[in-house]
Structures are given as structure tokens and as C-alpha cells.
Amino acid sequence: MEQEQDTPWTQLTEHINIQKKGNGQQTQKLGRPNLTRLMDHYLRIMSQVDMHKQTVSWKLWLSLRNPTQGSLKTRALKQWKSFNKQEWTD
């Protein structure tokens, strides 16, 4: 059976209780996830997503305030492509 790789998510969501058997081997028992740690992880991820969204919208706003020839060309091309897609679907 393939063993799961130890990722930050599995480290966060799994409590590993190591128990010794009589023959000296260690077994791992997966416990319930710690809800506080899960929520903390979720909030951190969502915060990073929000920061990314703010950065993207800020860059877009700056490009509209002070457009370069390249950014105008890119916007026009995107609008033309989306317009063509709508024509084909209508």
C-alpha cells in the first residue's frame, strides 16, 4: 500500500499518536484534526488569497490609470477574443 507523503496539510490535520507494540515496532494512529489549527490554517490561506486579489486589482487599476502601449494592446486583444467567443456561442 502506498504511503501518503507528509505535506503541511497532513501535518496540520492529523494528530499522530505513536504507540509501541510488544515487539518494539511503532504504529501510528491517526487522531481527529485539531479544529483550532484547521481554522488557523484556513484563515491564513484565505488571507493570502485576499492579498493576491488586492494585488491583482491594484495592478489592473494602475495599468488603467497609466496604460502603456503593450497593456492597451493586450486589453484590446482580450476584448476582441471574448467578443468573438460570444459571436460563436450566440
Curated annotation (Swiss-Prot):
Keywords: Apoptosis, Host cytoplasm, Host membrane, Host mitochondrion, Host mitochondrion inner membrane, Host nucleus, Host-virus interaction, Inhibition of host innate immune response by virus, Inhibition of host MAVS by virus, Inhibition of host RLR pathway by virus, Membrane, Modulation of host cell apoptosis by virus, Viral immunoevasion. GO terms for cellular component: host cell cytosol; host cell mitochondrial inner membrane; host cell nucleus; membrane. Residues 65-87 are annotated as: Mitochondrial targeting sequence. The record marks 66 as: Low pathogenicity. Is not encoded in all strains, and seems to be dispensable for replication. This is Protein PB1-F2. Belongs to the influenza viruses PB1-F2 family. It comes from Influenza A virus (strain A/Memphis/18/1978 H3N2). One of its GO terms (biological process) is symbiont-mediated perturbation of host apoptosis. Residues 1-29 have a biased composition (Polar residues).
